Amino acid sequence: VQPPHSHGDNFYIWT
């Protein structure tokens, strides 16, 4: 599973 790196679903929470 890949971390959410999108400005749509999640706002770079796993940065």
Curated annotation (Swiss-Prot):
It comes from the Bacteria. It catalyses: digallate + H2O = 2 3,4,5-trihydroxybenzoate + H(+). Optimum pH is 5.0. Active from pH 3.0 to 7.0. The keyword Membrane does not apply. Keywords: Hydrolase, Serine esterase. The keyword Hydrolase applies. Activity is enhanced by the addition of 1 mM Mg(2+) (more than 100%) and by the addition of 1% glycerol (22%). Activity is reduced by the addition of 1 mM of various metal ions, including Hg(2+) (98%), Fe(3+) (95%), Fe(2+) (94%), Ba(2+) (92%), Ca(2+) (76%), Co(2+) (70%), Zn(2+) (44%), Ag(2+) (14%) and K(+) (8%). Inhibited by the addition of 1 mM DMSO (75%), Triton X-100 (42%), sodium azide (40%), beta-mercaptoethanol (34%), Tween 80 (22%), Tween 60 (20%), EDTA (18%) and phenylmethanesulfonyl fluoride (PMSF) (7%) but not affected by the addition of SDS. Optimum temperature is 40 degrees Celsius. Retains 14% of its maximal activity after heating 1 hour at 70 degrees Celsius. It is an enzyme of class 3 (hydrolase). One of its GO terms (molecular function) is tannase activity. Transmembrane segments: none annotated. Its EC number is 3.1.1.20. Hydrolyzes ester bonds of tannic acid to produce gallic acid and glucose. Exhibits no cytotoxicity in vitro in Vero cells or in vivo in a rat model. Belongs to the tannase family. Monomer. This is Tannase. It comes from Bacillus subtilis. The lineage of its organism: Bacteria, Bacillati, Bacillota, Bacilli, Bacillales.
